[in-house]
Every structure is written in structure tokens, then in C-alpha cells.
């Protein structure tokens, strides 16, 4: 049965895309039905895909090739986050200095936490380079990690986990530290948890979503510039 399924899938160029979309749709449905943040569609979708590939004994390499079109949509999807930002352009202009300062500090904290973890765990340069761009969107982080000598595929997994944790804790952290300003919420979430966190920010409000989308772009640029400097701190 498994061999028949493998033969069927090998003859279909789009099965990886269909599997990915179906897994995410099922995860989104469960998230909507339960209303629990822990049932994140991205997390559930990833688990469903892993289970399917494991049960059917389908090599990940085959899935990766078939699902490649989904990867091509990462950059356009990230760019599309500029739409809510454009709708709040006046608010951005009024608070430009505070927003840029917040994103800059958040980026430095992210890089600093990676350095502290690397020193505490005595990570190698390769491991540190893999961990360093953990808080920026996959479209940027994997390229940065590869350029620095890290393991890009592992970076992608770390980025996803970072985003999911950020999305899960976003509202709790805001309540804990009495953060009520929507701009501050959006900047914090976008800088720390990239696109996955931004999906949560959009649920919290239009301003939060717009500021989070901006933070992804600015934090991505700052991280790409600063990572080559930071990686040299580990011998």
C-alpha cells in the first residue's frame, strides 16, 4: 500500500503543495474550533505533514521538491504585509522615531540573547550562526545563516519555533508588563516573532498588525547587517 502511494505521488508534481495547504487548513480549523492559542495552525500543520510523511515513508527530499512553489510565495507574502502599513502611514510618520528606536532595541536584544545562549552552551561557530537570525522571517534568516556558515534548514525550524512561541506569549507578555499602546505591541511582536507573530498582531488590531509588518522588514535589514559582526564574537 505504501509503495503504491509513493508511486502515485511520484507521478504528481503538486502533491506537496496540496498536502501543505490541506495540513494548514486542518490546523486553522482546529484553532478556530478550540480558540486556544497553543493550537497554532502553523505548528499543527507542520505536525500533520511530519506524521503523514513518516507513516507513508515518503522521503522529505521528495516532499521538499513537490512543495517548492510554497517557498516561492514566502517573499510575496512578506511584502503583502505592507498593505495594512500603508493604510496607517500617517500614524507611522507621527511616531517614526519611537518605532525605529523600538525595532532597533528589539533587534539588539534578540542578537544579544543568541550570543548569551551561545556562550552559556559553548556553541560552535556553525551552531551560533544557525541560531543568530532566529527572530527574523524565514525568507531572510535562512539566507543569512547560510552566508555565515550556519545550517539553513535548522535555522528555518528555529525561526518557526520562535514565531510560534512569540505568538502564544504575545498577549500574556503585554498584560504582564501593562503594555497597552497598540504601536508598542505591534513593534514588539513583529521584532521578536516575525510573520507568525504578525498573524497574531493582526488579530489584536489593525494598528498592531501594521506596526508588526513594518518591524519584520526593518528588523530583517538590521539583522542582516549586524549578523556578520556578531558571528565573529564566537571563535
Across the structure, where does each feature detected by a protein language model lie?
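Generic secondary-structure signature for well-ordered alpha-helical cores
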Residues: 31-35, 57, 150, 174-179, ...
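Alpha-helical membrane segments and immediately flanking helix-loop junctions
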Residues: 127-154, 158-161, 176, 180-218
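Helical membrane-embedded segments and adjacent short helical loop/helix-boundary regions
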Residues: 5-86, 91-102, 106
Amino acid at each position: 500500500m505504501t509503495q503504491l502511494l509513493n508511486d502515485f505521488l511520484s507521478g504528481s508534481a503538486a502533491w506537496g503543495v496540496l498536502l501543505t495547504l490541506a495540513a494548514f487548513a486542518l490546523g486553522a480549523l482546529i484553532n478556530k474550533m478550540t480558540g486556544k492559542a497553543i493550537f497554532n495552525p502553523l505548528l499543527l500543520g507542520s505536525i500533520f505533514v511530519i506524521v503523514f510523511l513518516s507513516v507513508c515513508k515518503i522521503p522529505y527530499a521528495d516532499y521538499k521538491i513537490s512543495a517548492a512553489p510554497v517557498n516561492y510565495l514566502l517573499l510575496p507574502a512578506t511584502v503583502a504585509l505592507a498593505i495594512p502599513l500603508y493604510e496607517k502611514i500617517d500614524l507611522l510618520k507621527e511616531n517614526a522615531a519611537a518605532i525605529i528606536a523600538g525595532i532597533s532595541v528589539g533587534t539588539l536584544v534578540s542578537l544579544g540573547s543568541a550570543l548569551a545562549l551561545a556562550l552559556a552552551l559553548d556553541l560552535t561557530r556553525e551552531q551560533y550562526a544557525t541560531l543568530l537570525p532566529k527572530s527574523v522571517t524565514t525568507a531572510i534568516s535562512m539566507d543569512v545563516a547560510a552566508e555565515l556558515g550556519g545550517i539553513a534548514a535548522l535555522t528555518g525550524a528555529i525561526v518557526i519555533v520562535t514565531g510560534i512561541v512569540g505568538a502564544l506569549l504575545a498577549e500574556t507578555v503585554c498584560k504582564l508588563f501593562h503594555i497597552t499602546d497598540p504601536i508598542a505591541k505591534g513593534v514588539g511582536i513583529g521584532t521578536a516573532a516575525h510573520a507568525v507573530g504578525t498573524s497574531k498582531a493582526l488579530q489584536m488590531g489593525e494598528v498592531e498588525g501594521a506596526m508588526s509588518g513594518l518591524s519584520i522588514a526593518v528588523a530583517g535589514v538590521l539583522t542582516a547587517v549586524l549578523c556578520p559582526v556578531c558571528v565573529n564574537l564566537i571563535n
